Amino acid sequence: MKKLYLIFIMTILGSFLQAQPVTLKSVDAEKEFRLKLYYGNGGKGAFVQYEGKKEIIPLRVKSYRLDTISGGPGQPAKHYFVWDEMVNGKFNGTYKMLQMQNYIADATYIRATDFRHFNLELVEEEGDPDGDDQYLLHGAKISFNHFYNNKLLIEYPDGKKMNAELPFPDSPDAAQQSIIEDYSFDGYDDLAFTIPDAGMGVYSMFTIYLYNPKSKRFGTV
């Protein structure tokens, strides 16, 4: 079974975008607002947190499209995301965004109550990225770091927490990558972490956390 998981990971690694959280700000609102958008491959595990707010708002993938052709040979792939904003389980708005590597374009938010359209733009962060990332998957908030440590924290909706350590890259230039997919083929997305072998680009180490819908917990394979 582990061999099957590894083959599955290797198949999709070539086409997915290693997303990291981005900060967006409004450009045409009467009062500027800012938000941080967290998301994984294909837009999965996404949520937003508005500046000055403690609450996080889940985002449900409405559509995702990968375009590897229109840019031509040697050009970065285009990732088109559309998310539904869900507040207390109810639809509250729509986010749209185009990403090409580190370039963000056509980011918008449409508020459901009055269909107000807000244009958003990327806020350029100063200094090097801290590597911190988070997902919201099956109601659990998952926190980890791509570059600087191997700590994994999963916080469940009932307040329980799980702490773990992930394999850490041998090379200082390597990064911890993550993939959200249904590895157990049971209709529920799971979570995998992969690191390259000594930074050579061959993904030889991986850790998979399968989601159990009965216990509502993640567990390693």
Where are the regions a protein language model picked out?
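N-terminal ectodomain recognition module in secreted, GPI-anchored, and membrane glycoproteins
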Residues: V48-E51
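Single-residue recognition of alpha-helix boundary sites
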Residues: L13-G14, D197
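Sec/Tat signal peptide C-region and signal peptidase I cleavage site
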Residues: S15-A19
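Sec-dependent N-terminal signal peptides
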Residues: K3-L13
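Low-complexity, repetitive regions of proteins mediating host interaction that are extracellular
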Residues: K2-K3, G159
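Beta-propeller-forming repeat regions
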Residues: P21, S26, E30-N41, K54-E181, ...
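Extended interaction-bearing regions that mediate binding to partners or small molecules
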Residues: G43-G45
